[in-house]
Amino acid sequence: EDAGEILVDGDAVFDNPQVKQNLFYLSDAPYYFSNATLQTMKEFYQNLYPQFDQDGFEMLIRQFNLNENKRIRTFSKGMKRQAFIILAICSNTKYILCDEVFDGLDPIVSKVVKDLFRQERKMRKMTLVMASHDLKELEDFCDSIGIIHKGDLLHSSEIRKETSDMHKIQCVFEQDEEAFLREHLHIVRYGRTGNFVTMVVKGEKEAIMQKIQEKTPVWCETIPLSIEEIFLCNMEGVDYDISKVIF
């Protein structure tokens, strides 16, 4: 059973039109009237958001080559997504809540949308909250990450902090050094194929590498840790049974 209340900047959202004028929900399946055109939906959102940016709207539909007089139901999935991203940005809200916002966009349009959001964030105070299963799309875009499972927030932190405190290291040892490494390092994940070891370790990078060098590895280097790997490491840390999801 759901409980509690939702606050935005300390104010309740429920039955509060003034607060809602600062929120735009960008759904993975945007709602539009059956025979609506982009022009129709623009007029609809202009009534909801007095601060709607008409000039910005006209500029963006030209940039994305969208016909504002064509019925939205004739648009492709990607075109629909582009249309509602434009409406979201031009509504000039303080917060945009995005659900699978890059789904259905080809790589080029996806990059254009990211650049558009970045530009908008530089021009005004605006926060994007994104829900996504495609973590790769968020890797070079988001400042913070939160992991939600069954209604609970399992983990949240700044991505920059995660990548500075967690390191993926690959080494080659002449003999098995797993016991030593586990004793002296905070190992989150460990894998070994022959003498080739791949591990994810938490802690200060310099101290970790110094400890590894005590065993004189034949070869050792750190490699970039993806946001997906950070996700998996954190989920394993809370005993999340990923097999139930995959299988």
Regions found by a protein language model. Name each.
Residues V113-G203:
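ABC transporter nucleotide-binding domain
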Residues G4-V19:
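Conserved ABC transporter NBD signature motif
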Residues P107-V109:
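Helix N-cap at the start of a conserved alpha-helix in ABC-type nucleotide-binding domains
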Residues V200-F247:
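C-terminal coupling/interaction segments
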Residues D2-E5, K150:
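Conserved coupling/switch loops of ABC nucleotide-binding domains, chiefly the family-specific signature
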Residues I96-E100:
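Catalytic Walker B motif of ABC-type/P-loop ATPase nucleotide-binding domains
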Residues S27-A83:
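ABC-family P-loop ATPase nucleotide-binding domains
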